Amino acid sequence: MASGILLNVKEEVTCPICLELLTEPLSLPCGHSFCQACITANHKKSMLYKEEERSCPVCRISYQPENIQPNRHVANIVEKLREVKLSPEEGQKVDHCARHGEKLLLFCQEDRKVICWLCERSQEHRGHHTFLMEEVAQEYHVKLQTALEMLRQKQQEAEKLEADIREEKASWKIQIDYDKTNVLADFEQLREILDWEESNELQYLEKEEEDILKSLTKSETKMVRQTQYVRELISDLEHRLQGSMMELLQGVDGIIKRIENMTLKKPETFHKNQRRVFRAPALKGMLDMFRELTDVRRYWVDVTLAPNNISHVVIAEDKRQVSSRNPQIMYWAQGKLFQSLKNFNYCTGILGSQSITSGKHYWEVDVSKKSAWILGVCAGFQPDAMYDVEQNENYQPKYGYWVIGLQEGVKYSVFQDGSSHTPFAPFIAPLSVIFCPDRVGVFVDYEACTVSFFNITNHGFLIYKFSQCSFSKPVFPYLNPRKCTVPMTLCSPSS
């Protein structure tokens, strides 16, 4: 009953020209309504044939263009009609056109849709190739059967990928748990001195576990969705193939496009051989370094700085801190006094007041926040003579310098003897320093002829060691703040 009324209403609001529901309906004085685009096209046609009067395409009653009025009432009916969704009991049958109510007997090859005879004559399908459903059903049955077999194969591949990612996830979990266990066991042996390293290593592994398992879980979720999607397509195809001819062809374009556009995506995985693996021997080496540092600290001496006559070097009152300042050079030109702010390459090396002629001696220098410095020991000069060390500086062991340095904030170097081709210039070799030191320890063993440098910031790791040093003269602690104005500080034994 309701469907019959609905069809009658649809007839009343269907454009007589395009046979579709009215779009932006306009009403003529005679009462007939048309789509705005359709009646406008009718006007142009009348002008083309030079007709003196414009007439209604239905009843042929003449009208003037200015008498055409928008029909809001009809527009509202059309809008409501488009929103109507009938229940299965009251709605149209599945084999009837939802738009025209006519029986679906034809198949449009271009749109791959089942249509009625009115659809075939509409603007949407005009010029398309249409066939009776019986003529194309077998062809599409073969296509869908082939697609079903292909999807079943893809289902197997998808399930294998899903299983692989789950196995990969479990493998990563076991591997990382194993590494965590090793870390805990190794750090337990070194608990007193390696608490920081233990915490740092565990944090790294926790972050690695979180990142990798999170990524693998996302991949697993994608694989599950992918598998489910394939299953849904298979279920849809099986339903179509087992149903009626109408069910086979109804919406077949959509299902074919989904199948054609579907490609299986492989999950993101990680290579175990590319990750950083924790090794306990490194901790044992760290323990050896720490024990060596503990041993040399027994020889800590209270070093202070000697007075100097270098104008651009500032020594603190406690004689533990030294810093450099940029020189300001005054000069006359054209009868006027000018100030130059140019940074000349002045030397800024300072000696410690304590001379070393025997035994073992150790001290530490705070170099935090500095971008450049040089430190170590220097031989052959008497600091109490107010001698400007820098006038004859040549950082080579053969000239009495056993030093290391930093430049540009990241480049650590050791100054060695120059080659035979450049004997008067030191060979500056780069040092591999993983953790930048805020404090450097210096140890001199006069009898063993060695000078060692320790990274106190990194648990006393050895930075560099000079061996077979020629200590034919007294040696002194040496500090050079270079052009960086941040001070260098000699640490007291109690610090």
UniProtKB/Swiss-Prot annotation:
An annotated Gene Ontology molecular function: zinc ion binding
Quaternary data: Can form homodimers and homotrimers. In addition to lower-order dimerization, also exhibits a higher-order multimerization and both low- and high-order multimerizations are essential for its restriction activity. Interacts with BTBD1 and BTBD2. Interacts with PSMC4, PSMC5, PSMD7 and HSPA8/HSC70. Interacts (via B30.2/SPRY domain) with HSPA1A/B. Interacts with PSMC2, MAP3K7/TAK1, TAB2 and TAB3. Interacts with SQSTM1. Interacts with TRIM6 and TRIM34. Interacts with ULK1 (phosphorylated form), GABARAP, GABARAPL1, GABARAPL2, MAP1LC3A, MAP1LC3C and BECN1.
Descriptive protein name: Tripartite motif-containing protein 5
Principal cellular location given in the protein's record: cytoplasm
Catalytic reactions on record: S-ubiquitinyl-[E2 ubiquitin-conjugating enzyme]-L-cysteine + [acceptor protein]-L-lysine = [E2 ubiquitin-conjugating enzyme]-L-cysteine + N(6)-ubiquitinyl-[acceptor protein]-L-lysine
Keywords: Acetylation, Antiviral defense, Autophagy, Coiled coil, Cytoplasm, Immunity, Innate immunity, Metal-binding, Nucleus, Phosphoprotein, Transferase, Ubl conjugation, Ubl conjugation pathway, Zinc, Zinc-finger
Protein's GO biological process: activation of innate immune response; autophagy; defense response to virus; innate immune response; positive regulation of canonical NF-kappaB signal transduction; positive regulation of MAPK cascade; positive regulation of NF-kappaB transcription factor activity; protein K63-linked ubiquitination
Gene Ontology terms: cellular component: nucleus; P-body
Residues covered by region (Required for interaction with GABARAP and for autophagy): 187-200
Zinc finger (RING-type) boundaries: 15-60
Zn finger limits (B box-type): 92-133
Domain B30.2/SPRY: 283-495
Keyword Acetylation: yes
Residues modified to N-acetylalanine: A2
Comment text on domains: The B box-type zinc finger domain and the coiled-coil domain contribute to the higher and low order multimerization respectively which is essential for restriction activity. The coiled coil domain is important for higher order multimerization by promoting the initial dimerization. The B30.2/SPRY domain acts as a capsid recognition domain. Polymorphisms in this domain explain the observed species-specific differences among orthologs.
UniProt cross-references to PROSITE patterns, sorted A to Z: B302_SPRY, ZF_BBOX, ZF_RING_1, ZF_RING_2
Function: Capsid-specific restriction factor that prevents infection from non-host-adapted retroviruses. Blocks viral replication early in the life cycle, after viral entry but before reverse transcription. In addition to acting as a capsid-specific restriction factor, also acts as a pattern recognition receptor that activates innate immune signaling in response to the retroviral capsid lattice.
EC top class named in words: transferase
UniProt-annotated location(s): Cytoplasm; Nucleus
Entry's EC annotation: 2.3.2.27
Phosphoserine PTM positions: S87
InterPro entries named among the record's database cross-references: B30.2/SPRY, B30.2/SPRY_sf, Butyrophylin_SPRY, ConA-like_dom_sf, SPRY_dom, TRIM/RBCC, Znf-RING_euk, Znf_B-box
